Each structure stands twice: as C-alpha cells, then as structure tokens.
Amino acid sequence: MQKFPMTGPGLQNLEAELRHLKSEERPAIIRAIAEARSHGDLSENAEYHSARERQSFIEGRIAELEEIISAAEVIDPSTLSGDTVKFGAHVELIDEESDKEVTYQIVGVHEADIKAGRISVTSPLAKSLIGKKPGDTVSVPAPGGDRSYEILAVRFG
C-alpha cells in the first residue's frame, strides 16, 4: 500500500472531514432520499436523482478519506532540523523577477493549499526546492515561462 506523507495537522483536518461526512452529511442525504421517495414516481423525480447523486459523491469521498487516512505517514516537522529543504520545511523565497518574498511549507499531496502557503511535495516548485539550501536559486517551469526563486531561509516546526 502506498504511504501518504503528511503533517499532523493535515491528518487531523482529513479526520475532521471524515467525521463530518459520516455524522452529518451521510444522515442528511439519507433523510433527503427518504423525503424524495415519499413524493412518488422515482423515474421522474429530480429531487430523488439529485439526492442519490449527492449520496454517491459523499460515499466516494468517505471511501477516499478512509484510504488516505489508513495509509498516512505522519511526519512531525518540529523534529526535523538543518538548513536543507525537505518535507515539512517552511521555505522563505524571493521571486527574482518581482522581488516579492513568499513563504511556503512543503506538505503532503492531500493537505496542500496554496492560499494558506502549503504546497504539495509533488508540485514543481517543491520538487525544485528539495535538497537545496539558503542562497541557492531554483528555476521552476510555470505557464507563463520559467520562474526563478532564491531561497532566503529554511525553518522547521
């Protein structure tokens, strides 16, 4: 079974989503299906078909989350050290073209959220950063052309 590296908070978020789906979404959709069934002929009952479609989505997401959680390999970034970029690191970068400073944490695929500053370990940027140190420059392929970043600092925890 493939292991999914992730941080503790990432695992907690997935577990919370799973609990929510099982305790709130699943019972609500079962009630919605029962209500739609009470309206009679199911062949032309849009509410029923919509509820069944939603149920299928919810059950699929539950199965996906259960698989991810069972294969999670939690890595605690606070136990890591050094100045080399690796999983869990907070990396301060400067975009060499715009001089804009950004900080990203390298996290697992299932917890990445660019708006929150968390990038997937499998993203082009993270792949180019892994193994590098402050002062190194990396070039990352982007839709508008390659972008260059200088690593300013690497932190853990």
Swiss-Prot record:
GO BP terms in the entry: DNA-templated transcription elongation; regulation of DNA-templated transcription elongation
Pfam families attached to this UniProt entry: GreA_GreB, GreA_GreB_N
Coiled-coil features, chain-numbered ranges: 46-73
Keywords: Coiled coil, DNA-binding, Transcription, Transcription regulation
Similarity-based family: Belongs to the GreA/GreB family.
Role noted for this protein: Necessary for efficient RNA polymerase transcription elongation past template-encoded arresting sites. The arresting sites in DNA have the property of trapping a certain fraction of elongating RNA polymerases that pass through, resulting in locked ternary complexes. Cleavage of the nascent transcript by cleavage factors such as GreA or GreB allows the resumption of elongation from the new 3'terminus. GreA releases sequences of 2 to 3 nucleotides.
NCBIfam families: greA, PRK00226.1-2, PRK00226.1-4, PRK00226.1-5
Name this polypeptide is given: Transcription elongation factor GreA
